[in-house]
Protein backbone atom coordinates (compact mmCIF):
# COMPACT_ATOMS: atom_id res chain seq x y z
CA UNK A 1 0.00 0.00 0.00
CA UNK A 2 1.31 3.47 -0.90
CA UNK A 3 2.16 5.72 2.00
CA UNK A 4 -0.67 8.14 2.95
CA UNK A 5 1.65 11.14 2.77
CA UNK A 6 2.24 10.40 -0.93
CA UNK A 7 -1.43 9.94 -1.87
CA UNK A 8 -3.56 12.26 0.31
CA UNK A 9 -4.09 15.59 -1.57
CA UNK A 10 -3.10 17.77 1.42
CA UNK A 11 -0.34 15.53 2.77
CA UNK A 12 1.13 15.32 -0.74
CA UNK A 13 1.81 19.09 -0.74
CA UNK A 14 3.43 18.95 2.72
CA UNK A 15 5.41 15.86 1.68
CA UNK A 16 6.82 17.47 -1.46
CA UNK A 17 7.70 20.67 0.43
CA UNK A 18 9.15 19.42 3.73
CA UNK A 19 9.76 15.65 3.63
CA UNK A 20 10.73 14.20 0.23
CA UNK A 21 12.00 17.53 -1.11
CA UNK A 22 15.37 16.94 -2.86
CA UNK A 23 17.90 19.35 -1.29
CA UNK A 24 21.60 19.97 -2.05
CA UNK A 25 23.86 17.97 0.26
CA UNK A 26 26.16 20.90 1.03
CA UNK A 27 23.91 23.78 2.13
CA UNK A 28 25.35 25.47 5.23
CA UNK A 29 23.75 27.11 8.27
CA UNK A 30 23.18 30.25 6.16
CA UNK A 31 20.27 28.32 4.61
CA UNK A 32 18.58 28.04 8.03
CA UNK A 33 17.19 31.57 8.03
CA UNK A 34 14.25 30.81 5.72
CA UNK A 35 12.75 28.41 8.27
CA UNK A 36 13.65 30.80 11.11
CA UNK A 37 11.71 33.57 9.34
CA UNK A 38 8.73 31.21 9.15
CA UNK A 39 8.98 30.59 12.90
CA UNK A 40 9.31 34.34 13.57
CA UNK A 41 6.18 35.01 11.50
CA UNK A 42 4.19 32.37 13.42
CA UNK A 43 5.40 33.79 16.77
CA UNK A 44 4.46 37.33 15.68
CA UNK A 45 0.99 36.30 14.47
CA UNK A 46 0.23 34.35 17.67
CA UNK A 47 1.55 36.96 20.13
CA UNK A 48 -0.09 39.72 18.07
CA UNK A 49 -3.42 37.91 18.17
CA UNK A 50 -3.34 37.73 21.98
CA UNK A 51 -2.27 41.38 22.23
CA UNK A 52 -5.14 42.42 19.93
CA UNK A 53 -7.59 40.82 22.40
CA UNK A 54 -6.66 43.45 25.01
CA UNK A 55 -5.50 46.42 22.91
CA UNK A 56 -7.79 49.36 22.06
CA UNK A 57 -7.01 51.43 18.96
CA UNK A 58 -8.19 54.76 20.36
CA UNK A 59 -5.89 57.73 21.01
CA UNK A 60 -7.35 58.18 24.50
CA UNK A 61 -6.87 54.57 25.64
CA UNK A 62 -4.15 53.00 23.40
CA UNK A 63 -1.24 53.83 25.75
CA UNK A 64 -3.26 52.78 28.83
CA UNK A 65 -4.29 49.51 27.17
CA UNK A 66 -0.62 48.59 26.57
CA UNK A 67 0.13 49.41 30.23
CA UNK A 68 -2.89 47.29 31.22
CA UNK A 69 -1.54 44.37 29.13
CA UNK A 70 1.83 44.58 30.89
CA UNK A 71 0.45 44.98 34.42
CA UNK A 72 -2.91 43.24 34.67
CA UNK A 73 -3.15 40.56 31.95
CA UNK A 74 -1.77 37.12 32.87
CA UNK A 75 1.69 36.94 31.27
CA UNK A 76 0.75 40.05 29.27
CA UNK A 77 4.24 41.48 29.82
CA UNK A 78 5.71 38.31 28.31
CA UNK A 79 3.44 38.39 25.25
CA UNK A 80 4.09 42.11 24.70
CA UNK A 81 7.89 41.79 24.94
CA UNK A 82 7.93 38.61 22.84
CA UNK A 83 6.07 40.56 20.15
CA UNK A 84 8.30 43.65 20.35
CA UNK A 85 11.59 41.73 20.45
CA UNK A 86 10.24 39.12 18.03
CA UNK A 87 10.16 41.93 15.46
CA UNK A 88 13.87 42.57 16.08
CA UNK A 89 14.67 38.87 15.67
CA UNK A 90 12.54 38.85 12.49
CA UNK A 91 14.64 41.66 10.99
CA UNK A 92 17.96 40.11 12.08
CA UNK A 93 16.94 36.90 10.28
CA UNK A 94 15.70 38.93 7.28
CA UNK A 95 18.95 40.85 6.89
CA UNK A 96 21.03 37.67 7.21
CA UNK A 97 18.72 35.88 4.73
CA UNK A 98 19.09 38.69 2.16
CA UNK A 99 22.86 38.86 2.82
CA UNK A 100 23.13 35.11 2.17
CA UNK A 101 21.22 35.59 -1.10
CA UNK A 102 23.62 38.36 -2.17
CA UNK A 103 26.77 36.43 -1.25
CA UNK A 104 25.85 33.12 -2.85
CA UNK A 105 24.02 34.49 -5.92
CA UNK A 106 20.56 33.22 -4.92
CA UNK A 107 19.14 36.31 -6.67
CA UNK A 108 19.53 34.45 -9.97
CA UNK A 109 16.21 32.76 -9.12
CA UNK A 110 14.39 35.87 -10.37
CA UNK A 111 10.80 35.09 -9.31
CA UNK A 112 11.82 33.91 -5.83
CA UNK A 113 14.08 36.96 -5.37
CA UNK A 114 11.44 39.50 -6.49
CA UNK A 115 8.78 37.99 -4.22
CA UNK A 116 11.42 38.24 -1.47
CA UNK A 117 11.93 41.97 -2.14
CA UNK A 118 8.14 42.41 -2.03
CA UNK A 119 8.08 40.51 1.28
CA UNK A 120 10.79 42.81 2.67
CA UNK A 121 8.69 45.88 1.81
CA UNK A 122 5.57 44.28 3.36
CA UNK A 123 7.40 43.37 6.59
CA UNK A 124 8.88 46.88 6.86
CA UNK A 125 5.42 48.45 6.37
CA UNK A 126 3.93 46.12 9.00
CA UNK A 127 6.70 46.87 11.52
CA UNK A 128 6.34 50.63 10.99
CA UNK A 129 2.58 50.53 11.61
CA UNK A 130 3.06 48.28 14.63
CA UNK A 131 5.48 50.79 16.16
CA UNK A 132 2.75 53.46 16.02
CA UNK A 133 0.20 51.40 17.99
CA UNK A 134 1.49 51.85 21.60
CA UNK A 135 0.91 55.62 21.06
CA UNK A 136 4.03 56.75 22.90
CA UNK A 137 6.02 59.86 21.97
CA UNK A 138 8.19 58.08 19.40
CA UNK A 139 5.13 56.27 17.99
CA UNK A 140 3.33 59.56 17.34
CA UNK A 141 6.28 61.55 16.04
CA UNK A 142 7.64 58.64 14.00
CA UNK A 143 4.23 58.31 12.32
CA UNK A 144 4.07 62.08 11.73
CA UNK A 145 7.56 62.32 10.21
CA UNK A 146 7.41 59.21 8.01
CA UNK A 147 3.88 59.74 6.65
CA UNK A 148 4.77 63.40 6.01
CA UNK A 149 7.46 62.24 3.56
CA UNK A 150 4.72 61.40 1.07
CA UNK A 151 3.97 65.12 0.78
CA UNK A 152 7.18 65.32 -1.29
CA UNK A 153 5.37 63.56 -4.17
CA UNK A 154 4.55 66.25 -6.77
CA UNK A 155 0.89 67.35 -7.30
CA UNK A 156 -0.82 64.68 -5.17
CA UNK A 157 1.54 64.66 -2.14
CA UNK A 158 -0.45 66.83 0.30
CA UNK A 159 -3.79 65.20 -0.55
CA UNK A 160 -2.22 61.75 -0.22
CA UNK A 161 -0.88 62.50 3.28
CA UNK A 162 -4.25 63.83 4.49
CA UNK A 163 -5.95 60.79 2.95
CA UNK A 164 -3.62 58.43 4.85
CA UNK A 165 -4.04 60.42 8.08
CA UNK A 166 -7.83 60.57 7.73
CA UNK A 167 -7.65 64.22 8.80
CA UNK A 168 -5.25 67.12 9.06
CA UNK A 169 -2.82 65.42 11.46
CA UNK A 170 -1.94 62.00 12.88
CA UNK A 171 -4.95 61.28 15.11
CA UNK A 172 -7.62 58.71 16.05
CA UNK A 173 -8.45 57.83 12.42
CA UNK A 174 -4.75 57.20 11.67
CA UNK A 175 -4.30 54.93 14.69
CA UNK A 176 -7.44 52.90 13.89
CA UNK A 177 -6.48 52.29 10.25
CA UNK A 178 -2.86 51.48 11.20
CA UNK A 179 -4.18 48.87 13.64
CA UNK A 180 -6.41 47.38 10.91
CA UNK A 181 -3.53 47.21 8.43
CA UNK A 182 -1.09 45.93 11.05
CA UNK A 183 -3.51 43.09 11.80
CA UNK A 184 -4.16 42.04 8.19
CA UNK A 185 -0.67 42.42 6.67
CA UNK A 186 0.99 39.45 8.46
CA UNK A 187 -1.57 37.13 6.83
CA UNK A 188 -0.76 38.65 3.43
CA UNK A 189 2.94 38.14 4.28
CA UNK A 190 2.20 34.47 5.10
CA UNK A 191 0.49 34.05 1.71
CA UNK A 192 3.41 35.73 -0.07
CA UNK A 193 5.84 33.47 1.82
CA UNK A 194 3.88 30.51 0.41
CA UNK A 195 4.34 31.88 -3.12
CA UNK A 196 8.04 32.50 -2.30
CA UNK A 197 8.40 28.80 -1.39
CA UNK A 198 6.38 27.72 -4.43
CA UNK A 199 8.80 29.49 -6.78
CA UNK A 200 11.82 28.21 -4.83
CA UNK A 201 10.65 24.60 -5.13
CA UNK A 202 10.26 25.04 -8.89
CA UNK A 203 14.03 25.52 -9.23
CA UNK A 204 15.35 23.85 -6.08
CA UNK A 205 17.69 25.48 -3.57
CA UNK A 206 20.97 27.13 -4.44
CA UNK A 207 24.11 25.97 -2.58
CA UNK A 208 27.36 27.62 -1.36
CA UNK A 209 29.35 26.65 -4.47
CA UNK A 210 26.73 28.13 -6.81
CA UNK A 211 27.09 25.02 -9.01
CA UNK A 212 24.28 22.71 -10.16
CA UNK A 213 23.63 20.17 -7.39
CA UNK A 214 21.23 17.87 -9.28
CA UNK A 215 23.79 15.05 -9.23
CA UNK A 216 23.97 15.06 -5.42
CA UNK A 217 20.63 15.63 -3.71
CA UNK A 218 19.45 14.32 -0.32
CA UNK A 219 15.91 14.23 1.14
CA UNK A 220 14.94 17.25 3.27
CA UNK A 221 13.74 14.96 6.08
CA UNK A 222 15.49 13.92 8.33
CA UNK A 223 18.70 15.80 7.44
CA UNK A 224 17.47 19.38 7.16
CA UNK A 225 14.48 19.05 9.48
CA UNK A 226 16.90 18.26 12.33
CA UNK A 227 19.19 21.08 11.20
CA UNK A 228 16.26 23.54 11.13
CA UNK A 229 15.06 22.42 14.58
CA UNK A 230 18.53 23.21 15.97
CA UNK A 231 18.31 26.69 14.38
CA UNK A 232 14.84 27.23 15.85
CA UNK A 233 16.05 26.22 19.33
CA UNK A 234 18.93 28.72 19.09
CA UNK A 235 16.50 31.43 17.91
CA UNK A 236 14.17 30.71 20.84
CA UNK A 237 17.15 30.80 23.23
CA UNK A 238 18.26 34.23 21.97
CA UNK A 239 14.70 35.63 21.91
CA UNK A 240 13.79 34.41 25.41
CA UNK A 241 17.12 35.66 26.81
CA UNK A 242 16.43 39.08 25.30
CA UNK A 243 12.83 39.15 26.56
CA UNK A 244 13.58 37.93 30.09
CA UNK A 245 16.86 39.75 30.79
CA UNK A 246 16.77 43.04 28.86
CA UNK A 247 13.41 43.49 27.12
CA UNK A 248 13.92 47.24 26.54
CA UNK A 249 17.45 46.97 25.14
CA UNK A 250 16.35 47.59 21.54
CA UNK A 251 13.46 49.95 22.32
CA UNK A 252 13.33 53.71 22.81
CA UNK A 253 12.78 55.19 26.30
CA UNK A 254 10.72 58.02 24.71
CA UNK A 255 8.00 55.50 23.93
CA UNK A 256 7.25 55.15 27.65
CA UNK A 257 5.94 58.73 27.55
CA UNK A 258 2.36 59.06 26.23
CA UNK A 259 2.06 60.78 22.84
CA UNK A 260 1.94 64.57 23.09
CA UNK A 261 1.48 66.57 19.85
CA UNK A 262 2.68 69.75 21.64
CA UNK A 263 6.05 68.36 22.71
CA UNK A 264 8.60 67.15 20.13
CA UNK A 265 11.27 64.65 21.31
CA UNK A 266 14.87 65.95 20.86
CA UNK A 267 15.79 63.12 18.46
CA UNK A 268 13.08 61.50 16.38
CA UNK A 269 14.32 58.12 15.18
CA UNK A 270 12.73 54.82 14.13
CA UNK A 271 13.47 51.34 15.51
CA UNK A 272 17.06 50.10 15.00
CA UNK A 273 16.19 47.98 11.93
CA UNK A 274 15.14 51.08 9.93
CA UNK A 275 18.11 53.25 10.91
CA UNK A 276 20.20 52.44 7.79
CA UNK A 277 17.36 53.60 5.49
CA UNK A 278 16.66 56.59 7.76
CA UNK A 279 20.34 57.63 7.53
CA UNK A 280 20.15 57.48 3.70
CA UNK A 281 16.95 59.57 3.81
CA UNK A 282 18.58 62.23 6.03
CA UNK A 283 21.80 62.38 4.02
CA UNK A 284 20.06 64.18 1.13
CA UNK A 285 19.12 67.83 1.89
CA UNK A 286 16.22 67.77 -0.60
CA UNK A 287 12.91 66.25 0.62
CA UNK A 288 11.89 64.49 -2.61
CA UNK A 289 15.48 63.34 -3.22
CA UNK A 290 15.61 61.88 0.28
CA UNK A 291 12.34 59.98 -0.19
CA UNK A 292 13.55 58.58 -3.53
CA UNK A 293 16.86 57.50 -1.97
CA UNK A 294 14.95 55.86 0.90
CA UNK A 295 12.78 53.79 -1.48
CA UNK A 296 15.72 53.01 -3.79
CA UNK A 297 17.85 51.78 -0.86
CA UNK A 298 15.52 48.73 -0.71
CA UNK A 299 14.35 48.68 -4.34
CA UNK A 300 17.99 48.45 -5.52
CA UNK A 301 17.81 44.78 -4.46
CA UNK A 302 15.45 44.11 -7.39
CA UNK A 303 18.10 45.42 -9.84
CA UNK A 304 20.93 43.21 -8.54
CA UNK A 305 20.15 40.14 -10.75
CA UNK A 306 20.54 42.34 -13.86
CA UNK A 307 23.92 43.64 -12.64
CA UNK A 308 25.39 40.14 -12.25
CA UNK A 309 28.34 40.21 -14.66
CA UNK A 310 30.36 37.33 -13.19
CA UNK A 311 30.54 33.96 -14.92
CA UNK A 312 30.36 32.33 -11.51
CA UNK A 313 27.17 32.47 -9.50
CA UNK A 314 28.48 32.43 -5.94
CA UNK A 315 31.15 34.64 -4.33
CA UNK A 316 32.70 31.53 -2.77
CA UNK A 317 35.61 31.53 -5.25
CA UNK A 318 35.77 35.31 -5.88
CA UNK A 319 38.01 37.00 -3.27
CA UNK A 320 37.72 40.56 -4.69
CA UNK A 321 33.92 40.42 -4.71
CA UNK A 322 34.05 39.02 -1.17
CA UNK A 323 36.04 42.08 -0.06
CA UNK A 324 33.42 44.40 -1.56
CA UNK A 325 30.60 42.40 0.04
CA UNK A 326 32.11 42.80 3.51
CA UNK A 327 32.75 46.51 2.85
CA UNK A 328 29.01 46.74 2.03
CA UNK A 329 28.17 45.03 5.35
CA UNK A 330 30.45 47.47 7.23
CA UNK A 331 28.85 50.37 5.33
CA UNK A 332 25.34 49.26 6.36
CA UNK A 333 26.47 48.99 10.01
CA UNK A 334 27.91 52.52 9.72
CA UNK A 335 24.60 53.79 8.28
CA UNK A 336 22.71 52.09 11.14
CA UNK A 337 24.94 53.89 13.67
CA UNK A 338 24.58 57.25 11.87
CA UNK A 339 20.77 56.90 11.73
CA UNK A 340 20.67 56.92 15.53
CA UNK A 341 22.88 60.02 15.88
CA UNK A 342 21.75 63.69 15.92
CA UNK A 343 21.97 65.72 12.70
CA UNK A 344 25.25 67.55 13.37
CA UNK A 345 28.91 67.52 12.37
CA UNK A 346 30.64 65.02 11.83
CA UNK A 347 27.63 62.66 11.54
CA UNK A 348 26.14 64.50 8.53
CA UNK A 349 29.21 64.04 6.30
CA UNK A 350 29.79 60.45 7.48
CA UNK A 351 26.16 59.61 6.61
CA UNK A 352 26.46 61.23 3.18
CA UNK A 353 29.69 59.38 2.36
CA UNK A 354 28.25 56.06 3.61
CA UNK A 355 25.08 56.60 1.50
CA UNK A 356 27.12 57.32 -1.65
CA UNK A 357 29.30 54.26 -0.96
CA UNK A 358 26.20 52.05 -0.50
CA UNK A 359 24.82 52.79 -3.99
CA UNK A 360 28.30 52.93 -5.55
CA UNK A 361 29.17 49.44 -4.27
CA UNK A 362 25.96 47.80 -5.50
CA UNK A 363 25.49 49.62 -8.81
CA UNK A 364 29.09 50.21 -9.97
CA UNK A 365 31.94 48.58 -8.04
CA UNK A 366 30.55 45.04 -7.69
CA UNK A 367 29.65 44.58 -11.42
CA UNK A 368 33.06 46.01 -12.50
CA UNK A 369 34.92 43.78 -10.02
CA UNK A 370 33.04 40.73 -11.37
CA UNK A 371 34.17 41.58 -14.91
CA UNK A 372 37.74 41.99 -13.65
CA UNK A 373 37.61 38.55 -12.00
CA UNK A 374 36.33 37.01 -15.26
CA UNK A 375 39.29 38.58 -17.05
CA UNK A 376 41.80 37.34 -14.44
CA UNK A 377 40.44 33.80 -14.86
CA UNK A 378 40.68 34.27 -18.66
CA UNK A 379 36.96 33.52 -19.02
UniProtKB/Swiss-Prot annotation:
Task: Name the domain of life.
Answer: Eukaryota
Q: Which family does it belong to?
A: Belongs to the cytochrome b family.
Which protein are we looking at?
Cytochrome b
Q: Name one GO biological process term.
A: mitochondrial electron transport, ubiquinol to cytochrome c
Picking any one GO molecular function of the record gives: metal ion binding
Q: Which UniProt keywords apply?
A: Electron transport, Heme, Iron, Membrane, Metal-binding, Mitochondrion, Mitochondrion inner membrane, Respiratory chain, Transmembrane, Transmembrane helix, Transport, Ubiquinone
Further remarks about this protein from its record: Heme 1 (or BL or b562) is low-potential and absorbs at about 562 nm, and heme 2 (or BH or b566) is high-potential and absorbs at about 566 nm.
Instruction: Name its species.
Output: Sorex preblei
Query: Which residues does the record give as heme b b566 binding sites?
Result: 97, 196
**TM segments?**
33-53, 77-98, 113-133, 178-198, 226-246, 288-308, 320-340, 347-367
Amino acid sequence: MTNLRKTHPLMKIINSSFIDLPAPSNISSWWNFGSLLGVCLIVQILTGLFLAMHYTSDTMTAFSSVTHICRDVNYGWLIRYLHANGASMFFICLFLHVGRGLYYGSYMFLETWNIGVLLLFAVMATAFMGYVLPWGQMSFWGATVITNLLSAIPYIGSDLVEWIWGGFSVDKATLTRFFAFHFILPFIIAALAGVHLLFLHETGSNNPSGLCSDADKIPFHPYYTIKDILGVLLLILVLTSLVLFSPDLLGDPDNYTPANPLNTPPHIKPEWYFLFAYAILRSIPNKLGGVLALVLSILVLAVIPFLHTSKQRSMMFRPFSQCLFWILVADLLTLTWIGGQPVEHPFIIIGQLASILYFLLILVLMPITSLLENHLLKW
